[in-house]
C-alpha cells in the first residue's frame, strides 16, 4: 500500500491489509487533523479495509468532528462499507476515473 497527501487530500494505492498499512494511514491523518477539519481520501483500488482503519476513521468523524469524504474506486469496498452502514458516516462516493 502507498499513501500520499497533498493539502487535505489523501490518496491510497493498493490494498489496505496490514498493521503497517493502518499505522501509515493513522500517522498521515493524525498530521493532517492538526491543520484541517475536512479531509478527502481517495482509496483507488483496495478491495477491503481492516477493522483498525475503519475504527480509526469512525473515531475521526464521531469523536474528533472531522468532516471526512471517502472516494472509493472498488465496488467490493463500497459494498463492505454499505454492509457496515458507514456510507453516510464516511460520506462515501464512487471514485470516477
Where are these regions (language model features)?
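A short acidic, often aromatic-flanked loop/helix-cap motif at beta-alpha or helix-coil junctions
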Residues: 10-12, 78, 96-97
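Short acidic-hydrophobic, aromatic-tinged amphipathic segments that line or gate anion-handling sites
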Residues: 89-97
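Amphipathic alpha-helical interaction surfaces in cytosolic regulatory modules
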Residues: 16-90
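Short beta-strand/loop segment at the start of cytosolic alpha/beta domains
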Residues: 1-11
Amino acid at each position: 500500500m502507498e499513501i500520499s497527501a497533498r493539502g487535505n487530500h489523501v490518496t491510497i494505492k493498493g490494498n489496505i491489509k496490514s498493521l503497517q498499512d493502518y499505522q501509515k494511514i493513522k500517522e498521515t491523518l493524525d498530521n493532517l487533523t492538526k491543520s484541517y477539519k475536512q479531509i478527502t481520501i481517495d482509496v483507488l483500488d483496495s478491495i477491503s479495509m481492516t477493522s483498525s482503519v475503519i475504527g480509526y476513521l469512525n473515531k475521526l468523524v464521531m469523536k474528533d468532528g472531522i468532516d471526512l469524504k471517502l472516494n472509493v474506486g472498488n465496488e467490493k469496498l463500497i459494498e463492505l462499507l454499505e454492509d457496515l452502514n458507514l456510507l453516510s458516516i464516511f460520506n462515501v462516493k464512487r471514485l470516477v476515473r
